Amino acid sequence: MNRIEGHLLAADLRFAIVSTRWNHLIVDRLVEGAELAFVQHGGKSENLDHFIVPGSHELPLVARRLAETGKYDAVVCLGAVIRGDTDHYKFVAGGAASGILNSALHTGVPIAFGVLTTETVEQALNRAGIKAGNKGAEATLAMIETVNLLRQIR
């Protein structure tokens, strides 16, 4: 049996990051982690474009448009949705997740769901690099690997 995996080399890749302005103190850390992961794996910062949207609800549409341009090998969506006292959290997080997945499937371009969905601000900060790694970096690494795997399949 042949085992085929993507490698973590971003030297010739061009990525778009789409991040939310909402919860920017958390999201800014995710963006920093994403950029660092891209560069540490051979990517050039000039091959990384950063787009900012108001909130997580806007991520899927902008990600899809970016994917459709053909300029990007992958799109990394970053945000933070923190549970509050109403059901708003469920609709925003669920809508963003399904919209991002549908955008990737529709365009054939890998699009990462790097949106934190947490109960508290503390949990979100931990996942943005304080204690539990940086989920922005993890989303970027997943896209580097996925793009390189897809190149082997074509």
UniProtKB/Swiss-Prot annotation:
It is an enzyme of class 2 (transferase). 5-amino-6-(D-ribitylamino)uracil binds at residues 22, 56-58, 80-82, 113. One of its GO terms (cellular component) is riboflavin synthase complex. InterPro entries: LS (IPR034964), LS/RS (IPR002180), LS/RS_sf (IPR036467). It catalyses: (2S)-2-hydroxy-3-oxobutyl phosphate + 5-amino-6-(D-ribitylamino)uracil = 6,7-dimethyl-8-(1-D-ribityl)lumazine + phosphate + 2 H2O + H(+). Keywords: Riboflavin biosynthesis, Transferase. Its EC number is 2.5.1.78. (2S)-2-hydroxy-3-oxobutyl phosphate binds at residues 85-86, 127. The active site is at residue 88. GO terms for biological process: riboflavin biosynthetic process. Belongs to the DMRL synthase family. Catalyzes the formation of 6,7-dimethyl-8-ribityllumazine by condensation of 5-amino-6-(D-ribitylamino)uracil with 3,4-dihydroxy-2-butanone 4-phosphate. This is the penultimate step in the biosynthesis of riboflavin. This is 6,7-dimethyl-8-ribityllumazine synthase. It comes from Deinococcus geothermalis (strain DSM 11300 / CIP 105573 / AG-3a).
